Amino acid sequence: MKALIPKYAVLPLALAFAVNCAAYFGARLFLGNTSYHHMTLPIDSIIPFVPAFIVVYLLAYVQWAVGYIMICRDSRQVCYYVMGAEIIAKCICFLCFVFYPTTMVRAEITGSSLFETAVRYLYEIDAPNNLFPSIHCLESYFCMRGAFISKKLSGWYRMIMILAAILVFASTVLLKQHVVADMAGAIITAEFALWFARKTHIDQWFAKINFLERRPPQ
């Protein structure tokens, strides 16, 4: 039976996860008494607070798991290319978090419904920093772009990834976890990272260092 995660994908996934943790949690070590910037736009005040979207926000983790596994199973080249771009993007996120830290005013939760209680808990465990660019949006965008980079994934799967990405993007602003600028920053960061990874042939670099790669017999 074919492994869920190919052996050649283990190292790229591990590196991507490590860099993600370093960028997100490590950046907070540098903040301290930092002055924060606000990137709220007029449109952000128009967007309503919809607690029910906490379901979509949490289900994003399922999309990421499925999306990255499918990307890694596609081929070595696609796996190395997308995961390399993912690592580049997280390095950019780290720089933004440290050198241009942003924050926002979150929604005032007065109710006690299940959804409102869940959002209140989210607010308590996730401080309003490390916002620009939005990692939540970044991950969903990479899953969607990876579906189109792949030559093997079907049209219906791509449509599902598009819909999932749209819903996740919407959830970040409807829960007042992010502002519109954070979403735009995620797209720009991802596209730049994909471009840079392609220009630098990062897939070839991964092929050289990946000691776990299964090489076909000569």
Predicted features by range, described:
Residues 29-42, 72-156, 204-218:
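Membrane-interface loops
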Residues 56-63, 135-139, 184-188:
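Membrane-embedded alpha-helical segments of multi-pass membrane proteins
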Residues 144-148, 190-198:
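Hydrophobic transmembrane alpha-helices
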Residues 8-16, 80-85, 157-161, 181:
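Alpha-helical transmembrane segments of integral membrane proteins
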Residues 107, 111, 128-132, 167-195:
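Interfacial helix-loop-helix junctions of multi-pass membrane proteins
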Residues 1-64, 119, 217-218:
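N-terminal transmembrane-helix/juxtamembrane module of multi-pass inner/ER membrane proteins
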Residues 21-22, 90-96, 163-174:
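Aromatic-anchored segments of alpha-helical transmembrane domains
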Residues 63-67, 140-145, 163-171:
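Hydrophobic, membrane-inserted alpha-helices
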